[in-house]
A protein has these predicted regions:
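N-terminal pre-domain/capping segments
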Residues: 1-231
Length: 232
């Protein structure tokens, strides 16, 4: 088993020397400065790989090579974006980086409701509270039909939370779910963007005609297209 660590590039406050000191062997990272859909060149990959190796570590996993929204919902630019993805995969392989994570969820990449949840021993961690996410989904985002995705008990808890949640907590929830956990991963929404809820809604609207089965079909189409490159 290899001890790996998610590292968010040279701007990460956790540096590679720190990770080496605590026994980390492999790095999980990506080319965070390359816009979604653009090709990861062998030069850019090699540069980051060499930088990581200069600290006695290795680039073990790509997390992630972003799948553009147009690939997921089947937009007109899908074919070109898939071709770019295939080239990026091939370039990673040429550079010896063999494990690549991807995400096919609409709009979101990962969700937490708290990025510094305190624990009794004085430590903190990322945290997901399902009721707070449901509150965000129903009361803040106002997603059409969202109530149907939750139980009566969960809806009751959302109502109870609505009685006590502060405006500051609402803003923190928006910042955590939309900006912090999405922006640095897929670049759709960035720090400083005005009205991130409206931006999030516009992105979500791209999927208004996409049901579960269509999304699965689009995922199958994508995987079928890239698999020959992966197998090489």
């Amino acid at each position: 088993m290899e001890k790996t660590w998610r590292w968010f590039g040279k701007k990460d406050k956790i540096t590679l020397p720190m990770l080496r000191q605590i026994g980390v062997e492999g790095i999980v990272t990506a080319l965070h400065d390359v816009p979604n859909g653009e090709i990861w060149t062998t030069e850019a990959i090699s540069d980051l790989k060499s930088y990581i190796e200069s600290y006695g570590l290795r680039w073990s996993v790509v997390e992630s090579l972003p799948v553009c929204e147009a690939i997921k919902y089947g937009g007109t630019e899908r074919e070109q974006l898939i071709e770019n993805y295939k080239v990026s995969l091939a370039n990673l392989g040429k550079c010896g980086v063999k494990t690549v994570c991807y995400n096919f969820m609409p709009v979101i990449d990962w969700i937490r409701t708290d990025l510094q949840h305190p624990w009794a021993d004085g430590t903190s961690s990322l945290y997901y509270d399902h009721i707070r996410f449901a509150y965000f989904d129903i009361r803040i985002l106002g997603r059409e039909g969202a109530e149907k995705d939750y139980t009566e008990e969960e809806l009751h808890k959302v109502d109870e939370l609505d009685k006590v949640i502060t405006e500051a907590e609402k803003e923190a929830l928006i910042d955590t779910i939309i900006v912090k956990t999405q922006g640095f991963v897929n670049g759709n929404i960035k720090e400083g963007d005005k009205n991130p809820v409206a931006i999030f809604k516009r992105l979500l609207a791209l999927y208004k005609d996409i049901d579960r089965e269509t999304l699965r079909e689009n995922m199958h189409y994508f995987l079928s297209a890239i698999m020959p490159v992966c197998e090489e």
